[in-house]
Amino acid sequence: MARYDRAITVFSPDGHLFQVEYALEAVRKGNAAVGVRGTDTVVLGVEKKSTPKLQDSRSMRKIASLDTHIALACAGLKADARVLINRARVECQSHRLTVEDPVTVEYITRYIAGLQQKYTQSGGVRPFGLSTLIVGFDPYTEKPALYQTDPSGTFSAWKANATGRNSNSMREFLEKNYKDTSGKETIKLAIRALLEVVESGGKNIEIAVMTHKDGLRELEEAEIDEYVAEIEAEKAAAEAAKKGAPKET
């Protein structure tokens, strides 16, 4: 068993690649992350751990811009994320230089997933211990897109999805509450999904919003607090209405 446990390129007798499964476990223990695709907006949200008093919180960003029209959030090992993000940015720049056109969201997703897959079958390396949520706008159709990749190199397109810690709870919430929305409602859905698993409300949440016209913008803490207050007020009003509703006889 130990041989299959250590070797990245050797399958166990029951068909498992243990190092890939360990990388998936690193994702499950990482920060919560969520992505939501609206009709004219895409939103990324991540759980933000509290930083020491003397640390600059700007150095701990978990949402990165790959190009003017594409952004990425990840769950898992931050050092691995830095390597993958740098490789993806270089690919975006190289594509602009050689093709003279920006990459599509699907193209860069395939590139990232292909890179992750190569690290599951090469000697002297290990799988990337992170899962990514990639959002953006297609430069040709101007339509929003959301993709997810995982350490095995699998990728898929989504309307809304979550990864990282307690991702199943967030995904269940999104399945119950997702609707094709625009602007503010899309942002609120992403925040509501994170609040299902993140404690201390808005101060432990990082949100980035992208539109085709304005590109990527990270929300300030005050803006997130306003959304959280609005969500809590709506929840309180719904509970009050439920209690005040007449019981059926």
From Swiss-Prot:
SUPFAM superfamilies per UniProt: N-terminal nucleophile aminohydrolases (Ntn hydrolases)
Subcellular location: Cytoplasm; Nucleus
Gene Ontology CC entries for this record: cytoplasm; nucleus; proteasome core complex, alpha-subunit complex
Keywords assigned: Cytoplasm, Nucleus, Proteasome
Name of a matching Pfam family: Proteasome_A_N
Gene3D superfamilies: Glutamine Phosphoribosylpyrophosphate, subunit 1, domain 1
Record carries keyword Nucleotide-binding: no
Domain of life of the organism encoding this protein: Eukaryota
GO BP terms: ubiquitin-dependent protein catabolic process
Similarity section: Belongs to the peptidase T1A family.
Quaternary data: The 26S proteasome consists of a 20S proteasome core and two 19S regulatory subunits. The 20S proteasome core is composed of 28 subunits that are arranged in four stacked rings, resulting in a barrel-shaped structure. The two end rings are each formed by seven alpha subunits, and the two central rings are each formed by seven beta subunits. The catalytic chamber with the active sites is on the inside of the barrel.
Function: The proteasome is a multicatalytic proteinase complex which is characterized by its ability to cleave peptides with Arg, Phe, Tyr, Leu, and Glu adjacent to the leaving group at neutral or slightly basic pH. The proteasome has an ATP-dependent proteolytic activity.
Listed name of the protein: Proteasome subunit alpha type-7-A
Species the sequence originates in: Oryza sativa subsp. indica
